[in-house]
C-alpha cells in the first residue's frame, strides 16, 4: 500500500536534479546576457524603458488592429485606441504625451482654428451638443474666455452650470498656461461671478472613477439640469466627458450601456476612448440594476432585501430634498400614504410643475436620423428598378462593413422594441411640453408633406419586405415625390408627438379656435427636485391605457356639468389610434359629454389591461361625488383591504402591472400619481412590505416589545430608525384620516400588523403579537391625534 507514494516522491527529486544541472550549465550565458542588458539599460532613459515594457507586454494579435477577434466583436462599440496606444498613454511622461497626441503648446483641442463651425457649438471652443441641454466641450482658457466672449455665449445658450472633470495641474504642457490660483486654464470664479454654477470632480486622464463616485456625479448633473443647461469638459471633452454623459443617459433613460455609447458618439465623435472607459459605462449599467429593483417578486427579478438594505439602495438613487425627506422611509410607503390622503381630501395630486428637460424626443430623433442617413445613402445608390433587391438586412450588413456608429440594428433593438409593439408611440409625455407654437406645428406638417421620417418613428418602421411597397419607400425619402401612402401617413401622424399628449391629461376646456388645451398630471413638489427628469423608454405611450377624466382637476365653470371634451374618432382605413387622419389631412374630432356618460371616455385601442382600467375608471366620478367623510372611510377601508367595489382578482392584476412598471420604468413614479383607486394603491403598498426578505418587525423585535409593552408610548422608539419611521408613516396616515369607525380602525391595525410581522392571528404566537402591537399602535395614534389637535399640520 505504500509503494505508489514512494515512487511519486522520487519524481520531484529527479526533476530538481536535472533542472539544477541545466541551470548550472547555462549560468555563464545567463550572466553574459544580463550584463549586456544592464549596460544597455543605463543608456536608455527610464521613460523609454517603460515604453519598451508596455510594448513587450502586448501580444502581436493585440497590436494588429485587423485582428479577427476585433472583427467578430464589431457589433459592439469598440475603443478608439489600440491596447498599445492605451498602455503608452499611461507610461509616457505628460509633456511628451502632450506634444505627441495634442500638439503641445499648439494643442489642437484648444485651438479654435483647427475646428469647423459645426464642431464649435460654442464659438471658440471645440464643443458639441450631445442633447439639447448637455454640452460636451474641450477645456476653455482665460484667453479664450475673453477673446470669444464665452460667458456671454453661455448666457445666450442658457447654460447655467459647468462641470470640470480635470485635476488641478493636469496637461500643463498643452495650450495656454495654467492659472496658478486654480491649477486649471481658467479661473472658476469667472463663471461663478457670472451666475454660472461650477462643479469639479477630479478624474484621472484616460482613467475611470469608482461607480459610486460616478453615481454622485450623475445625481449632481441631474440637479444641475433642473437649473438649466450644463456644459461638461475634461481636456478634449471626449473620454471622461463622454463617460459621464453616457452614464447619465443610462441613469436617466434606462438605456443599455452600448446604446448610450452609440448615442454619445453619434453626437460627439470619438468619445469614450479606452477599454476601461467602455467597461466603466457597462459596469455602471449593471450597478444600477439592483438599485432600481423595488419588487423582487416580479420581473425583472432580483434577490429579496431587508428594509435596512432597501433604504441603503434608495439612498444611492435619491438626492436633494427627496433624499433628506426619505432617508428612513421607503419611497413607495410615503407616496402611497400621501396619495391616499389626497384622494380622501379630494385635493389635486400635484401643486407645481418644474421646468424639466426631456431627453426622449432627442434620443428618438438622433437614432432615427442615424438610421435615415444610412438609408438615404443606400437609396441613392439604387434607381427605382433596383429597389426590388433592397432589404433592411442588406443595409445593416453594409453598415457593419462601413464601420459606422450604428453598426447593427440589434444594438438599439431594446430601445425600439417596446415602441414597435405600442405602435411606435412617442415617449416621456409627462416631461414634454403639451402646447406647441405655430412654427412647431408647421414644421411638423412640413416633415410629413416632404415625406421625411418624423422624430418619433425609426426608419425601419417604414420598411417592408414587399418589393412593390419598397418602391414607395424610395419615394418616401425622395424630395421629388412628397406623396405618401395613406396608411403610412396615418401611422406617421399617429406616432408623431404633436398629436399624442392625451394619455396623462384630460381636457380642461377649449380655446376659441377649437384647439385642445390639456391638463397635465404634475409631480409633487418634494419629489420634483431630486427626480431624474429625463426619462427615455420608461415613458413610452401605451395606446391601450385610457385617459381617466378627473373631475376634481377640471376648473369649474358656469356650466361645468356640460363641459365637452373632444374625442378622436376613427372614420376611415380601419384606424383607431389616438388621432385618425381623414382624407383632407385634418384630425377628426367630435364632442363627448363626460358629465352625462356613466362610462369614462378613452383614447386609442383598448387592450386587455385597458378594458379593466375602463371598468375601474368608471367609478372615479362617483368617488369624487362622495362627501369628505365618506371618502375618508373609503380610504381607511382600502388600508384595511375591505374591498367592496372591485373584484379582488382584478385588483391583483392591476397591482402586478404596477409592480412591473415600478421595476422597469422611471416614469411609473409619476404615472402612479394618477392612480385614483385607493384599493389598488394600498394593495400595492402592502405587497411591497410583505415581499421584503425579513418582516419589518422581526421576532427579536417582538420579544423586545413584549418586554417593554408597559411603556407603549416609547416602545416604537426602541426599534431601528428605518423601522420606526416606516411604521409611523402609516400611523400618521391613519391619524390624518381623522374620525373613522372603530371597527374600520381595528381592521386597519390588524392589516398593518399582519404586513409588518408576516404573522397571522391564528398562528401559534399570533394573539400575543397582535395584542402587543395593537396596544402600542393605539397608544401612538392617541398621542398623534392629541398633537394634531393642538397643532394642526398638513398631511404627509
Curated annotation (Swiss-Prot):
GO MF annotations in UniProt: protein tyrosine phosphatase activity
Active site residues per record: 234 (phosphocysteine intermediate)
Any one Gene Ontology cellular component term annotated for this protein: cytoplasm
Keyword Hydrolase: yes
EC category: hydrolase
Catalytic activity, EC: 3.1.3.-
CDD domains on file: PTP_PTPDC1
Keyword terms, alphabetized: Cilium biogenesis/degradation, Hydrolase, Phosphoprotein, Protein phosphatase
Protease found in the keyword field: no
Single biological process term from Gene Ontology: cilium assembly
Residue positions where Phosphoserine is found in the record: 435, 437
Domain Tyrosine-protein phosphatase residues, every copy: 126-297
PANTHER family, per the entry: TYROSINE SPECIFIC PROTEIN PHOSPHATASE AND DUAL SPECIFICITY PROTEIN PHOSPHATASE (PTHR23339)
Record's function text: May play roles in cilia formation and/or maintenance.
Family: Belongs to the protein-tyrosine phosphatase family. Non-receptor class PTPDC1 subfamily.
Name of this chain's protein: Protein tyrosine phosphatase domain-containing protein 1
Amino acid at each position: 500500500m505504500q509503494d505508489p507514494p514512494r515512487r511519486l516522491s522520487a519524481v520531484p527529486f529527479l526533476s530538481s536534479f536535472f533542472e539544477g544541472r541545466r541551470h548550472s550549465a547555462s549560468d555563464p550565458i545567463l550572466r553574459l546576457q544580463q550584463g549586456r542588458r544592464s549596460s544597455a539599460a543605463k543608456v536608455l532613459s527610464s521613460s523609454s524603458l517603460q515604453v519598451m515594457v508596455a510594448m513587450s507586454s502586448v501580444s502581436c494579435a493585440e497590436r494588429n488592429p485587423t485582428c479577427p477577434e476585433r472583427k467578430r466583436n464589431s457589433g459592439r462599440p469598440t475603443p478608439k485606441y489600440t491596447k498599445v496606444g492605451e498602455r503608452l498613454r499611461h507610461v509616457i511622461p505628460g509633456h511628451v504625451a502632450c506634444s505627441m497626441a495634442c500638439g503641445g503648446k499648439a494643442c489642437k483641442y484648444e485651438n479654435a482654428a483647427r475646428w469647423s463651425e459645426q464642431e464649435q457649438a460654442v464659438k471658440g471652443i471645440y464643443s458639441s451638443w450631445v442633447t439639447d441641454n448637455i454640452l460636451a466641450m474641450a477645456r476653455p482658457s482665460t484667453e479664450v474666455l475673453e477673446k470669444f466672449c464665452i460667458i456671454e455665449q453661455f448666457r445666450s445658450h442658457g447654460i447655467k452650470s459647468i462641470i470640470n472633470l480635470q485635476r488641478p495641474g493636469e496637461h500643463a504642457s498643452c495650450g495656454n498656461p495654467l492659472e496658478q490660483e486654480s491649477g486649471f486654464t481658467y479661473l472658476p470664479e469667472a463663471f461663478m461671478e457670472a451666475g454660472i454654477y461650477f462643479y469639479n470632480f477630479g478624474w484621472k486622464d484616460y482613467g475611470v472613477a469608482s461607480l459610486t463616485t460616478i453615481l454622485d456625479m450623475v445625481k449632481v448633473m441631474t440637479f444641475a439640469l433642473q437649473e438649466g443647461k450644463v456644459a461638461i469638459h475634461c481636456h478634449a471633452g471626449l473620454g471622461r466627458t463622454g463617460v459621464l454623459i453616457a452614464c447619465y443617459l443610462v441613469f436617466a433613460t434606462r438605456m443599455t450601456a452600448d446604446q448610450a455609447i452609440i448615442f454619445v458618439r453619434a453626437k460627439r465623435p470619438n468619445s469614450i476612448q479606452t477599454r476601461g472607459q467602455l467597461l466603466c459605462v457597462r459596469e455602471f449599467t449593471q450597478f444600477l440594476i439592483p438599485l432600481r429593483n423595488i419588487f423582487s417578486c416580479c420581473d425583472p427579478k432580483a434577490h429579496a432585501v431587508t428594509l435596512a438594505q432597501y433604504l441603503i439602495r434608495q439612498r444611492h438613487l435619491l438626492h436633494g430634498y427627496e433624499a433628506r425627506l426619505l432617508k428612513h422611509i421607503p419611497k413607495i410607503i410615503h407616496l402611497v400614504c400621501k396619495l391616499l390622503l389626497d384622494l380622501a381630501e379630494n385635493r389635486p395630486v400635484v401643486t407645481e410643475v418644474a421646468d424639466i428637460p426631456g431627453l426622449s424626443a432627442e434620443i428618438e430623433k438622433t437614432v432615427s436620423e442615424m438610421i435615415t442617413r444610412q438609408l438615404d445613402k443606400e437609396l441613392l445608390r439604387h434607381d427605382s428598378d433596383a429597389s426590388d433587391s433592397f432589404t433592411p438586412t442588406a443595409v445593416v450588413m453594409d453598415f457593419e462593413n462601413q464601420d459606422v456608429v450604428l453598426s447593427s440594428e440589434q444594438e438599439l433593438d431594446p430601445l425600439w422594441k417596446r415602441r414597435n409593439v405600442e405602435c411606435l408611440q412617442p415617449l416621456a409625455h409627462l416631461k414634454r411640453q403639451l402646447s406647441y407654437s405655430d412654427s412647431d406645428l408647421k414644421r411638423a406638417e412640413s416633415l410629413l408633406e416632404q415625406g421625411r421620417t418624423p422624430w418619433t418613428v425609426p426608419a425601419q418602421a417604414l420598411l417592408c419586405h414587399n418589393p412593390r411597397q419598397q418602391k414607395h419607400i424610395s419615394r418616401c425619402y425622395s424630395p421629388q415625390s412628397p406623396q405618401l401612402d395613406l396608411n403610412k401617413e396615418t401611422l406617421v401622424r399617429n406616432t408623431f408627438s404633436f398629436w399624442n399628449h392625451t394619455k396623462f391629461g384630460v381636457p380642461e376646456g377649449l380655446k376659441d379656435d377649437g384647439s385642445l388645451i390639456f391638463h397635465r398630471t404634475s409631480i409633487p413638489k418634494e419629489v420634483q427636485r431630486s427626480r431624474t427628469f429625463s426619462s427615455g423608454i420608461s415613458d413610452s405611450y401605451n395606446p391601450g391605457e385610457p385617459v381617466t377624466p378627473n373631475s376634481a382637476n377640471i376648473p369649474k365653470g358656469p356650466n361645468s356639468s356640460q363641459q365637452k371634451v373632444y374625442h378622436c374618432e376613427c372614420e376611415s382605413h380601419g384606424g383607431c389610434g389616438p388621432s385618425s387622419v381623414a382624407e383632407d389631412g385634418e384630425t377628426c374630432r367630435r364632442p363627448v359629454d363626460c358629465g352625462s356618460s356613466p362610462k369614462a371616455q378613452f383614447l386609442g385601442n383598448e387592450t386587455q389591461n385597458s378594458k379593466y382600467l375602463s371598468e375601474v375608471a368608471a367609478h372615479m366620478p362617483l368617488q369624487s361625488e362622495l362627501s369628505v367623510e365618506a371618502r375618508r372611510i373609503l380610504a381607511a377601508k382600502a388600508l384595511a383591504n375591505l374591498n367592496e367595489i372591485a373584484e379582488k382578482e382584478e385588483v391583483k392584476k392591476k397591482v402586478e402591472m404596477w409592480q412591473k412598471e415600478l421595476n422597469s420604468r422611471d416614469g411609473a413614479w409619476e404615472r402612479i400619481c394618477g392612480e385614483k383607486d385607493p384599493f389598488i394603491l394600498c394593495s400595492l403598498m402592502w405587497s411591497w412590505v410583505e415581499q421584503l426578505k425579513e418582516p419589518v418587525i422581526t421576532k427579536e423585535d417582538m420579544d423586545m416589545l413584549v418586554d417593554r409593552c408597559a411603556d407603549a408610548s416609547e416602545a416604537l422608539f426602541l426599534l431601528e430608525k428605518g423601522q420606526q419611521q416606516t411604521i409611523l408613516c402609516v400611523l400618521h396616515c391613519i391619524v390624518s384620516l381623522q374620525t373613522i369607525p372603530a371597527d374600520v380602525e381595528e381592521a386597519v391595525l390588524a392589516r398593518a400588523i399582519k404586513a409588518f410581522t408576516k404573522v397571522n392571528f391564528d398562528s401559534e404566537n399570533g394573539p400575543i403579537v397582535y395584542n402587543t402591537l395593537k396596544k402600542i399602535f393605539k397608544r401612538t395614534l392617541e398621542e398623534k391625534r392629541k398633537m394634531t389637535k393642538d397643532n394642526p399640520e398638513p398631511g404627509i
